């Protein structure tokens, strides 16, 4: 590729905050706010017929999204490097929202399955930062310039490649934070208008949804190292049925060993194999887990649900010895009002 930036480029990252940062009371705005898309981060490199979808880890995702490669060649300029997110929207119950499950399924080794899924669940690309266009490297330009150049180069986009909405009004961003969750989005991102693009640096600010739930401990998995517990498996009651909803992980080495010793008395026999479909927390390569007696309740922090399951891995907060497992049901969960992805792209208008 003959582009101003060589493949790969590490994406600029975001640090977490609890609230949307406010604009100064006097003087011009310093922040630009955007919806936080919940997909696969990707930097698109296009040089004519050559297209690379660079992941956050530096891998090329192009083979998993052939329909997106063709869309990029049809809809984006001949020579461009643009940072953004790969998403899969799907219509459900009369509205279109982001579908993390369908997106996750796209990372598959079989070319035949990739082709089938490209037709069944086509992906879209949401661009939010222009790093280069033509022979110009724009990473040293302020974000306000890069944003304007992105709109000049791409327009609002479509039908498969879009530019994300943006505003400098913090009140609008706070409204987006609440409304757009119903379309499967993850929160809001704030960027300094005068900020240059700094790969692998946490220069942006992300504000994500945060919730807690009391869940039933139904089992655990051993850590991939073979030492201690890797994840705790969580369940909620749906009437009389106890359903697995996801897992909690990210324990220290010491805590993994402590948990294994603590839960050994609750163990019910040998490993079992989950007999449902593989998910992001239950891959096809690792479906064995150890069931335990239904006695313990865990309070966890989570962000969103995907149908009846956690969208992402939860974070362990504490044991709840005061709770009866039978009291842990779906009715405790907050359900956002549904919202359509097309309206998010249009800026909530």
Regions found by a protein language model. Name each.
Residues 1-349:
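Catalytic cores of nucleic-acid ligases and guanylyltransferases
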């Amino acid at each position: 590729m003959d582009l101003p930036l060589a493949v790969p480029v590490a994406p600029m990252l975001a640090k977490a905050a609890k609230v949307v940062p406010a604009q100064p009371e006097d003087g011009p705005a310093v922040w630009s706010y955007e919806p936080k898309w919940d997909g696969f981060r990707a930097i698109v490199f296009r040089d004519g017929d050559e297209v690379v979808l660079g992941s956050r880890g530096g891998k090329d995702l192009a083979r998993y999204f052939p329909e997106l490669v063709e869309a990029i060649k049809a809809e984006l300029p001949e020579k461009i490097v643009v940072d953004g997110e790969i998403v899969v929207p799907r219509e459900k119950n009369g509205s279109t929202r982001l579908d993390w499950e369908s997106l996750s399924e796209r990372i598959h080794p079989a070319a035949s399955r990739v082709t089938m899924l490209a037709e069944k669940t086509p992906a879209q690309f949401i661009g939010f930062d222009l790093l280069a266009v033509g022979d110009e490297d724009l990473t040293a330009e302020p974000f306000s310039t890069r944003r304007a150049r992105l709109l000049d180069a791409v327009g609002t986009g479509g039908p498969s490649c879009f530019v994300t909405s943006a505003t400098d009004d913090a009140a609008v961003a706070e409204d987006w934070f609440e409304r757009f969750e119903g379309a499967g989005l993850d929160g809001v991102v704030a960027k300094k208008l005068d900020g240059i693009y700094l790969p692998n640096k946490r220069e942006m600010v992300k504000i994500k949804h945060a919730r807690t739930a009391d869940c039933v401990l139904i089992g655990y998995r051993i850590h991939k190292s073979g030492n201690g517990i890797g994840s705790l498996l969580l369940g909620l009651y749906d009437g009389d049925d106890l359903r697995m909803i996801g897992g909690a992980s990210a324990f220290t080495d010491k805590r993994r060993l402590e948990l294994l010793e603590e839960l050994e008395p609750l163990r019910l026999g040998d490993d079992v194999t989950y007999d449902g479909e593989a998910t992001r927390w239950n891959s096809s390569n690792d479906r064995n887990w150890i069931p335990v007696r239904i006695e313990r309740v865990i309070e966890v922090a989570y962000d969103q649900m995907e149908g009846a399951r956690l969208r992402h891995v939860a974070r362990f907060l504490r044991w709840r010895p005061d709770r009866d497992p039978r009291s842990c049901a779906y009715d405790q969960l907050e359900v956002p009002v549904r919202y359509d992805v097309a309206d998010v792209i249009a800026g909530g208008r």
